[in-house]
Amino acid sequence: MESHTMLSAQSRWRNAMADTFAMVVYCTVVNMLIEIFLSGMSFEQSLSSRLVAIPVNILIACPYGIYRDFFMRQARKMNNKGWTKTIADILAYVTFQSPVYAAILWVIGADWHQIVAAVSSNMVISMMMGAVYGYFLDYCRRLFKVTSYQQLKA
């Protein structure tokens, strides 16, 4: 029984590390590109945003992973087709990340128009790339040898 508890704790630790790594890397790269090229923010504003976002991403990575896994379990209950997973990934990403992203931009001093432009752009791009993050997260979980959400019991 004790080894099961240790394995479970180790699995949770690996899951947390994988989720954190994926969140920090993905959000830094994608959001910096959005902020500079689509939202008209300066490099310095975007860099400030990303520096504020890293500790935030570290804090929200595990809750997001749990939130996303919930969406995945619900999608699996509906059916086990690939498009259902894609939609669940998109919905989880957009509904969780958009309010967090808006708050980060507000904290670094972006004006209302920049916030709306960045969050709106991020939402549109997330509809195309939200599933990409899901696949990236799954990849990171495999790298960290985490039991994938498909293998977990609901």
Curated annotation (Swiss-Prot):
GO biological process entries: amino acid export across plasma membrane
Keywords on record: Amino-acid transport, Cell inner membrane, Cell membrane, Membrane, Transmembrane, Transmembrane helix, Transport
Membrane association type: Multi-pass membrane protein
GO CC, alphabetical: plasma membrane
HAMAP family: L_Ala_exporter
Protein family membership: Belongs to the AlaE exporter family.
Name assigned to this protein: L-alanine exporter AlaE
Species assigned in the record: Escherichia fergusonii (strain ATCC 35469 / DSM 13698 / CCUG 18766 / IAM 14443 / JCM 21226 / LMG 7866 / NBRC 102419 / NCTC 12128 / CDC 0568-73)
Gene: alaE
